[in-house]
C-alpha cells in the first residue's frame, strides 16, 4: 500500500491532466477518464441556473486498489471555484493516495472541458436548399412527425390514454388502421405518470384483443414489444432513466402520459415549459404527449390552441397539436365518441377532424371505429366541424330551411345565409323552392321530385 501511495504521489497534476480523456455520451452527459490514476467521472443532469451558474451531478468512481468503486456523488455548480475546491477536498478524504492538489487539477480539467462543450452547443451546418422531394416525414401519419413532438389534449375521461394506447399498439404491430398510417413496426416506450402497470397492462390487452392481435391463428397468446416505465418524479429527474431505456431498446416513439404530471413545476411558467421542451429534444425520438385543457377549454369542450392548459410556449414548442373532444350527448353506455381536432400544424396542411368510436361490451373494449363528419354532425361533436361540414351534416337526410339548418348548428338563419349561398354557388348544395314558396337547402341528390302527394320541389 505504501509503495502505491509513493508512486501515485510522485505523479504531477500536469501528467494526470495530460492523461485525461473526455467523452460526450449525449447532450448534457459526459464521462471523464484518467487511465493512469484509475479514476472515472460522470457528469450529467446539467441545468442553467438563474444566476448563470451551470449546475451538474458529478459521480466519481475508482478502480484503484484502495477505495475501489464509487467514491463520491454530488450535485454542484461546476462554474463555482469554491464548489469545485470543496468537491476535490472531499475526494481527497475518500482517497488520500491522490494529493489534494492533484484532485483539484483533475476536477478543474473535467469541469472546464464539460463547460466548453456544453456552451458551444451543436455545430452549425450548411443548408443546401436543393431538396427536390419536399415532404413531411411522418412516423405516424397524420399525427406524429419523425423526431418531433405531438400533443393530444382533452379533459379527464375524454379517452386520451386509450387513444395513445391504441396508437402504441398500431406502432408495435406496424399496422395501418382507421386512417392512421404506420409503415413498419416501431419500438414504443410508454412513460406513465398517472396510473400503474396493472391498469396499463389491462388496457393494452383490451386494445390488442379488439384489433385481433392478442392471439395468433392457433389461439396462442402473442406478447407485445411495448416497453412500460412507471414515472413518479419530474421529467428532469426521470430523463436519465428514460434515455437509458431509449438507447437499450432502440425506441422510436416515446409516449408521455401526461405532461402536467411530468413537468414538476407551474405549467404557466414559461421557464418551466421551455426547460421541458429542451429536455425532450435531447431524447431525439418522436414524442406523443398527453395533456389537459385549461378551465375555459373544459367549459367550452372546444379544442383550439388557447384551450391548452399552461404557457403559450407549450403551443410554440409542439409541432402537431390535437384537441380531443368527447361527445357529452352519447346516451349508449357501451359507446364513447371522440374527435381529434387539428389545432396546430407547422409543416403540414390542417387535417380534417378525425372521429373515433370506442365500442365496449359488458367488461371490455370490443372495437375502435372511425366515424365520418355526417355522424359527428348528429351529436354535440358537430361544434368541432367547419360550418361547411355542419351544414352538410344538417341536410344529410333531408332538405331543410335556413332556420332549421341554423337551429341544428345553434346559430340564427341570418348568421349562415351567406355560407348557404356560397355552397349553392359551388354546387355543394341545391336551393329548393316548395309549392308554398318555402326555400329549402339540400344535397344535390335531394333536388328531385318527392313522393306522390308531396310538395313539388324546383331546383334553382
Where does each model-flagged region fall?
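Conserved inter-motif catalytic segment of the P-loop NTP-binding fold
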Residues: 32, 45-46, 183-267, 271, ...
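C-terminal regions of RecA-like/P-loop NTPase motor modules
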Residues: 1-39, 247-248, 330-460
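Conserved catalytic network of the ASCE P-loop NTPase/AAA+ motor domain
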Residues: 180-183, 246-248, 280-283, 315
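Short gly/ser/thr-rich secondary-structure transition/capping motifs
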Residues: 130-137, 236-237, 302-305
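The Walker A/P-loop phosphate-binding site
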Residues: 110-207, 214
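N-terminal nucleic-acid engagement/recognition segments and initiation subdomains in replication
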Residues: 1-116, 460
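Short, structured interface segments
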Residues: 104-122, 363-375
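Phosphate-binding/switch region of NTP-binding enzymes
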Residues: 151-152, 157, 161-162, 191, ...
Amino acid at each position: 500500500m505504501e509503495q502505491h501511495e509513493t508512486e501515485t504521489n510522485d505523479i504531477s497534476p500536469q501528467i494526470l491532466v495530460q492523461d485525461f480523456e473526455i467523452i460526450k455520451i449525449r447532450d448534457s452527459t459526459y464521462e471523464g477518464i484518467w487511465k493512469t490514476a484509475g479514476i472515472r467521472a460522470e457528469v450529467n443532469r446539467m441545468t442553467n441556473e438563474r444566476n448563470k451558474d451551470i449546475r451538474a451531478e458529478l459521480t466519481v468512481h475508482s478502480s484503484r486498489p484502495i477505495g475501489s468503486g464509487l467514491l463520491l456523488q454530488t450535485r454542484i455548480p461546476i462554474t463555482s471555484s469554491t464548489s469545485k475546491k470543496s468537491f476535490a477536498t472531499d475526494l481527497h478524504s475518500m482517497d488520500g493516495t491522490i494529493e489534494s492538489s492533484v484532485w483539484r487539477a483533475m476536477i478543474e480539467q473535467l469541469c472546464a472541458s464539460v463547460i466548453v462543450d456544453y456552451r458551444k452547443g451543436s455545430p452549425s451546418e450548411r443548408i443546401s436548399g436543393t431538396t427536390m422531394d419536399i415532404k413531411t416525414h411522418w412516423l405516424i401519419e397524420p399525427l406524429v412527425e419523425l423526431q418531433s413532438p405531438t400533443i393530444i389534449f382533452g379533459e379527464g375521461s375524454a379517452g386520451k390514454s386509450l387513444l395513445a394506447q391504441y396508437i402504441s399498439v398500431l406502432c408495435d404491430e406496424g399496422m395501418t388502421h382507421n386512417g392512421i398510417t404506420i409503415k413498419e413496426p416501431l419500438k414504443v416506450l410508454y412513460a406513465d405518470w398517472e396510473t400503474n402497470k396493472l391498469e396499463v397492462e389491462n388496457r393494452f390487452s383490451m386494445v390488442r384483443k379488439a384489433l385481433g392481435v392478442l392471439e395468433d391463428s392457433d389461439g396462442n397468446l402473442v406478447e407485445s414489444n411495448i416497453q412500460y416505465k412507471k414515472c413518479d418524479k419530474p421529467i428532469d429527474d426521470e430523463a436519465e432513466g428514460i434515455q437509458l431505456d431509449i438507447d437499450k431498446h432502440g425506441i422510436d416513439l416515446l409516449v408521455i402520459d401526461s405532461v402536467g404530471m411530468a413537468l414538476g413545476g407551474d405549467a404557466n411558467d414559461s421557464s418551466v415549459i421551455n426547460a421541458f421542451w429542451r429536455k425532450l429534444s435531447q431524447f431525439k425520438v418522436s414524442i406523443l404527449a398527453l395533456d389537459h385543457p385549461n378551465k375555459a377549454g373544459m367549459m367550452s369542450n372546444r379544442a383550439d390552441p388557447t384551450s391548452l392548459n399552461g404557457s403559450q410556449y407549450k403551443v410554440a414548442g409542439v409541432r402537431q397539436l390535437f384537441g380531443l373532444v368527447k361527445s357529452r350527448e352519447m346516451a349508449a353506455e357501451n359507446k364513447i365518441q371522440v374527435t381529434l381536432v387539428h389545432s396546430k400544424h407547422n409543416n403540414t396542411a390542417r387535417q380534417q377532424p378525425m372521429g373515433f368510436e370506442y365500442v365496449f361490451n359488458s367488461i371490455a373494449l370490443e372495437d375502435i371505429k372511425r366515424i365520418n363528419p355526417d355522424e359527428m354532425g348528429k351529436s354535440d361533436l358537430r361544434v368541432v366541424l367547419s360550418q361547411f361540414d355542419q351544414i352538410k351534416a344538417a341536410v344529410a337526410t333531408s332538405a331543410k330551411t335556413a332556420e332549421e339548418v341554423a337551429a341544428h348548428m345553434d346559430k340564427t338563419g341570418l348568421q349562415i345565409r351567406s355560407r348557404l349561398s356560397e355552397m349553392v354557388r359551388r354546387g355543394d348544395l341545391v336551393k329548393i323552392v316548395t309549392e308554398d314558396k318555402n326555400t329549402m337547402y339540400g344535397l344535390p341528390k335531394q333536388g328531385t321530385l318527392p313522393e306522390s302527394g308531396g310538395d313539388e320541389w324546383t331546383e334553382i
